[in-house]
């Protein structure tokens, strides 16, 4: 592809996804621990040849969209229309001010689009002007009539399954969409069909069987199982932290402000529960400890909320393609009493970590009045974290 080609993406995410079952629009449901739309958008956002990603969303989904794609670079979302075709046109019109050379049009419900497919889409549009990814049909296809009886068996060798991203010269597909809208044509099921109607020759390029569209509840179950099977490297880490009491009227424990007659002596907010948990996660990653990532000698972390330390550790797991399986913290103290706040702390850890509360445990014990915790001079915490990473044979000893 010539370096002068500017490529943008229309990410279509305005549908309601009713066939996917309960749980809201399918593009905002999680798959493999991440929202479907996040996975789709991230693939394009990180691609070196894509300069703009234009999301098209349902106006009722604004809050869900913002939460689902937090941290990803994209254009301000534009509202979709009553049909997919109308939504694509809205996305193209929103991109017109950027004057891209190439545009890729992708369904947000396809979260497993690869860098290779994206690169092939850009290259194909640059060479041909209009192209779509396809995969061969492996089953025998039957054409049936109104009676349900078989009327014909088409030649499987000529059949292909169309996928997205479908790629086009921007000016050509924008004009085709505008013409279709002007002529009152709203029955096209994909952008290639509009291009064909407009008289364009649509080329094909190699798609990817993994780049499937999530449509039914069974699709989600199957893909969750596939992703879980890929995360065969199960690791566990442990952490420990302690802080002495000082002056104050509260302490931070597991992300929760707890009223107390004393405060913590600490460089940050002194949240021993979260500090131990961060060390456990970093330990599972073999990625140093909290002090190496957030040195107490750095004034930047003076009084810092420990929420950001835990978010950082969770992001390190995600960067390795992993998922958190379980988080557990045990608080060791006489006071304050942890029991009444246990579920509040679990919920807060789950919220910070982006995991279900069923994967978070908070326990409490005492040292039977022994040692510094028994004398109520401070609080200690131990933690464990279990994570799953993609299996990499090269990291295993022979």
UniProtKB/Swiss-Prot annotation:
What InterPro entries does its record include?
A: IspD (IPR001228), IspD/F (IPR026596), IspD/TarI (IPR034683), ISPD_synthase_CS (IPR018294), MECDP_synthase (IPR003526), MECDP_synthase_CS (IPR020555), MECDP_synthase_sf (IPR036571), Nucleotide-diphossugar_trans (IPR029044)
Cofactor dependence:
a divalent metal cation
Region of interest (2-C-methyl-D-erythritol 2,4-cyclodiphosphate synthase), ranges: 235-398
One Gene Ontology BP term is: terpenoid biosynthetic process
Which reaction is this enzyme known to catalyze? Answer: 2-C-methyl-D-erythritol 4-phosphate + CTP + H(+) = 4-CDP-2-C-methyl-D-erythritol + diphosphate; 4-CDP-2-C-methyl-D-erythritol 2-phosphate = 2-C-methyl-D-erythritol 2,4-cyclic diphosphate + CMP
Record site: Positions MEP for the nucleophilic attack: 156, 213
Pfam families associated with the record: IspD (PF01128), YgbB (PF02542)
A molecular-function term among this protein's GO annotations: metal ion binding
- State the NCBIfam families in the record: ispD, ispF, PRK09382.1
What this chain does, per the entry, is described as: Bifunctional enzyme that catalyzes the formation of 4-diphosphocytidyl-2-C-methyl-D-erythritol from CTP and 2-C-methyl-D-erythritol 4-phosphate (MEP) (IspD), and catalyzes the conversion of 4-diphosphocytidyl-2-C-methyl-D-erythritol 2-phosphate (CDP-ME2P) to 2-C-methyl-D-erythritol 2,4-cyclodiphosphate (ME-CPP) with a corresponding release of cytidine 5-monophosphate (CMP) (IspF).
Protein's UniProt name:
Bifunctional enzyme IspD/IspF
Taxonomy of origin reads: Bacteria, Pseudomonadati, Pseudomonadota, Alphaproteobacteria, Hyphomicrobiales
Q: Please state the gene responsible for encoding this protein.
A: ispDF
């Amino acid at each position: 592809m010539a370096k002068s080609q500017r490529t943008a993406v229309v990410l279509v995410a305005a549908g309601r996804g009713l066939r996917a079952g309960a749980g809201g629009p399918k593009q905002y449901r999680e798959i493999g621990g991440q929202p479907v739309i996040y996975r789709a958008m991230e693939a394009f956002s990180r691609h070196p040849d894509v300069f703009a990603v234009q999301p098209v969303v349902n106006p009722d989904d604004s809050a869900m969209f913002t939460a689902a794609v937090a941290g990803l670079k994209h254009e301000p979302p534009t509202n979709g229309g009553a049909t997919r075709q109308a939504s694509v046109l809205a996305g193209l019109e929103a991109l017109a001010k950027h004057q891209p050379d190439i545009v890729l049009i992708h369904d947000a419900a396809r979260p497993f689009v690869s860098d290779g497919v994206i690169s092939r889409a850009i290259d194909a549009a640059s060479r041909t002007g209009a192209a779509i990814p396809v995969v061969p049909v492996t089953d025998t296809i039957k054409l049936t009539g109104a009676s349900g009886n078989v009327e014909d068996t088409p030649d499987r060798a000529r059949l292909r399954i169309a996928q997205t991203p479908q790629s086009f010269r921007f000016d050509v597909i924008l004009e085709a969409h505008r013409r279709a809208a002007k002529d009152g044509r709203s029955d096209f099921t994909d952008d290639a069909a509009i291009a064909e109607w407009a008289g364009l020759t649509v080329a094909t390029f190699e798609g990817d069987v993994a780049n499937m569209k999530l449509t039914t509840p069974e699709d989600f179950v199957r893909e969750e199982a596939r992703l879980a099977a890929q995360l065969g490297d199960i690791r566990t880490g442990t952490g420990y932290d302690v802080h002495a009491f000082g002056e104050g009227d509260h302490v931070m424990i597991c992300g929760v402000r707890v009223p107390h007659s004393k405060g913590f002596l600490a460089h940050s907010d002194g949240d021993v529960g979260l500090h131990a948990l961060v060390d456990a996660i970093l330990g599972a990653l073999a990625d140093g400890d909290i002090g190496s990532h957030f040195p107490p000698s750095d004034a930047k972390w003076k009084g810092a909320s420990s929420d950001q330390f835990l978010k950082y550790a969770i992001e390190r797991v995600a960067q390795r393609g992993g998922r958190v399986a379980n988080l557990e913290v045990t608080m060791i103290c006489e006071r304050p009493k942890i029991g009444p706040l246990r579920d509040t702390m679990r919920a807060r850890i789950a919220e910070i970590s982006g995991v279900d509360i069923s994967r978070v445990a908070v326990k409490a014990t005492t040292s039977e009045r022994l040692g510094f915790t028994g004398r109520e001079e401070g609080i200690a915490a131990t933690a464990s974290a279990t994570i799953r990473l993609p299996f990499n044979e090269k990291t295993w000893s022979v």
